[in-house]
């Protein structure tokens, strides 16, 4: 193999590596991320969407009953991988989302608390969506 052919093949290989890296970087966020295990609050829900919604709501109300500490709720949600809590007009929320190639799933916890940091209301919402 001549020096020119080796040089040409090296350039082609570098271009291919660059192209593949660019494509992977561009579409990384669209790759499935469901390979991570679900946190305890979201794991093990029934296959039926209606039942799963009810079970998640019950699970959240049982784990964080009205009157419990808001800070404990926020710390546990953060430790379980839920996003930073949002707030609007005294109502707080934190969500966890998972996606695969066709479906997405979202678990959201919403709550209100009094001035002393105790929960006055708490709800859990599970929303599966497949296109």
Question: Where are the predicted features?
Answer:
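Short, Lys/Arg-rich N-terminal segment immediately upstream of the first membrane anchor
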Residues: 1-5
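A cross-family detector of function-defining hotspots
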Residues: 74-110
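Compositionally biased P/S/T/G-rich terminal and signal peptide-adjacent segments
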Residues: 20-58
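Amphipathic N-proximal alpha-helical interface segments
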Residues: 101-131
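Terminal, regulation- and interaction-focused segments at domain boundaries
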Residues: 43-75, 80
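Hydrophobic membrane-insertion alpha-helices, especially the h-region
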Residues: 6-26
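Short helix C-cap/helix-to-loop transition motifs enriched in small/turn-promoting residues
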Residues: 70, 83, 117-120
């Amino acid at each position: 193999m001549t020096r020119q052919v080796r040089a040409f093949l090296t350039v082609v290989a570098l271009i291919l590596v660059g192209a593949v890296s660019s494509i992977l970087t561009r579409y990384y966020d669209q790759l499935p991320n469901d390979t991570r295990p679900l946190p305890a609050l979201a794991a093990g829900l029934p296959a039926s969407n209606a039942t799963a919604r009810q079970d998640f709501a019950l699970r959240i109300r049982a784990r964080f009953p009205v009157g419990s500490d808001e800070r404990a709720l926020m710390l546990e949600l953060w430790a379980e991988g839920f996003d930073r809590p949002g707030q609007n007009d005294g109502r707080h929320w934190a969500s966890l989302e998972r996606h695969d190639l066709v479906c997405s799933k979202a678990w959201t916890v919403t709550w209100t608390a009094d001035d002393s940091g105790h929960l006055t209301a708490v709800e859990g919402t599970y929303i599966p969506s497949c296109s």
